[in-house]
Amino acid sequence: MSANQEEDKKPGDGGAHINLKVKGQDGNEVFFRIKRSTQLKKLMNAYCDRQSVDMNSIAFLFDGRRLRAEQTPDELDMEDGDEIDAMLHQTGGSGGGATA
């Protein structure tokens, strides 16, 4: 076992890590392993860095509900192997319909 793996295994932290899959609109899947107590913004930032997109242009959804960056897997009762959807924000339209 490497020193890195030993750091992840602490006595009494049974199941402190969780494996999550982030699936993009294009079907691309990225896998992450984070602590259950880690805020999801860490995962969101890592996903956006890998995809070279701005975090503000992506909506992350779990069970159809939008995720907030400060939430944790524990708060959301996420289980190992759960899937998060990463959807590109739809922007556009007439620009707000300004009136004179």
Curated annotation (Swiss-Prot):
Main location: nucleus
Recorded superkingdom: Eukaryota
A GO molecular function held by the record: protein tag activity
Compositional bias segments (type: Basic and acidic residues): 1-12
SMART domains referenced in this protein's UniProt entry, alphabetically: UBQ
Observed phenotype of the null mutant: No visible phenotype.
Cross-link Glycyl lysine isopeptide (Gly-Lys) (interchain with K-? in acceptor proteins) residue location(s): G93
Assembly, per entry: Interacts with SAE2, SCE1, SIZ1 and MMS21. Interacts with HSFA2. Covalently attached to ABI5, FLD, GTE3, HSFA2 and ICE1.
Additional comment: Stress conditions rapidly and substantially elevates the amount of SUMO1 and SUMO2 conjugates with a concomitant reduction in the amount of free SUMO proteins. The SUMO conjugation system plays an important function in stress protection and/or repair.
Entry protein name: Small ubiquitin-related modifier 1
The organism of origin for this protein: Arabidopsis thaliana (Mouse-ear cress)
